[in-house]
C-alpha cells in the first residue's frame, strides 16, 4: 500500500564459468532463470542484479531476466580500488555491454565509501544512455577489537559525501554495507526530487 517498490535481489552464484570453472554460460543463464521466475511470480516490482564481480555472470543474469520476465532490471557491479572489477572489467565497458543487453539502470554497489566511488560513476556516465546507480558502503570496513566488521561513516557524513556521486552523474542512489535507516534518511535529505533512492 505504500510508495516503496519491492526489488527481487539476485547476486553471484559462487561458481566459475569454463574454462576456469565447471559451469558453462547456458547453464548459468538457466540457474538465473529459475530464480527470476520465482521472484516474478512472487510479485516483485523490479529485479536488482547486484554485487557482481564478473561481467560474464552479470550478462547471464540480465539475459535470463529479459528472457523470462518483463520487469525492469538494475545491474550493479563491484569495483576494486583500481576502478576495475575483480575479473578486470572497467566501468565504461560494463556500462556499454549491459545497456546494450537491455538493462534499465547500470551502476556500482558495495566496494567502497561514497568518495572512492566517484571515478567509477564518472566513467560510466561518459557512455551511459540510461541512468547510473551508486550504492556505496558506509565507508571502508574495519575490524573492531572483537574481530567484528564495522563501518565507521556516520549518517550525516554519508549524506554529505553522496553529493559527490550526484555531481559525478549518479541518478539512482542508495546504501550498501554498514548503512542504516539513518544513512538513507540523510541521503533522502540531500537528494533532488529527480533522483531515486534505492
Segments predicted by a language model, with ranges:
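Glycine-rich nucleotide/cofactor/substrate-binding loop typically near the N-terminus or early
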Residues: 1-7
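Non-cysteine beta-strand/loop elements that form the S-adenosyl-L-methionine
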Residues: 7-10, 74-76, 130-138
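Alpha/beta enzyme core
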Residues: 17-75, 81-131, 156-168
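Histidine/acidic-residue-rich catalytic or RNA/ligand-binding cores of hydrolases
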Residues: 117-121, 144-152, 184-185
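Active-site clefts of carbohydrate-active enzymes
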Residues: 133-149
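Catalytic cores of alpha/beta
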Residues: 160, 182-183
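Single conserved hydrophobic/aromatic residue that forms the stacking wall/gate
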Residues: 188-198
Amino acid at each position: 500500500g505504500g510508495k516503496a517498490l519491492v526489488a527481487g535481489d539476485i547476486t553471484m552464484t559462487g561458481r566459475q564459468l569454463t574454462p576456469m570453472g565447471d559451469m558453462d554460460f547456458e547453464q548459468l543463464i538457466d540457474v538465473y532463470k529459475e530464480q527470476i521466475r520465482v521472484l516474478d511470480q512472487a510479485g516483485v516490482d523490479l529485479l536488482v542484479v547486484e554485487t557482481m564481480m564478473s561481467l560474464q555472470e552479470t550478462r547471464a543474469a540480465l539475459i535470463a531476466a529479459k528472457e523470462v520476465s518483463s520487469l525492469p532490471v538494475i545491474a550493479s557491479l563491484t569495483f576494486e580500488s583500481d576502478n576495475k572489477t575483480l575479473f578486470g572489467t572497467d566501468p565504461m565497458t560494463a556500462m556499454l555491454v549491459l545497456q546494450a543487453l537491455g538493462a534499465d539502470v547500470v551502476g556500482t554497489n558495495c566496494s567502497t565509501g561514497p568518495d572512492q566511488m566517484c571515478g567509477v560513476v564518472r566513467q560510466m556516465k561518459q557512455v551511459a544512455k540510461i541512468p547510473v546507480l551508486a550504492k556505496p558502503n558506509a565507508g571502508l570496513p574495519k575490524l573492531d577489537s572483537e574481530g567484528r566488521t564495522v563501518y565507521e561513516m556516520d549518517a550525516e557524513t554519508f549524506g554529505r559525501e553522496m553529493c559527490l556521486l550526484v555531481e559525478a552523474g549518479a541518478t539512482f542512489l542508495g546504501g550498501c554495507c554498514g548503512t542504516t535507516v539513518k544513512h538513507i534518511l540523510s541521503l533522502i535529505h540531500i537528494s533532488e526530487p529527480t533522483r531515486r533512492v534505492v
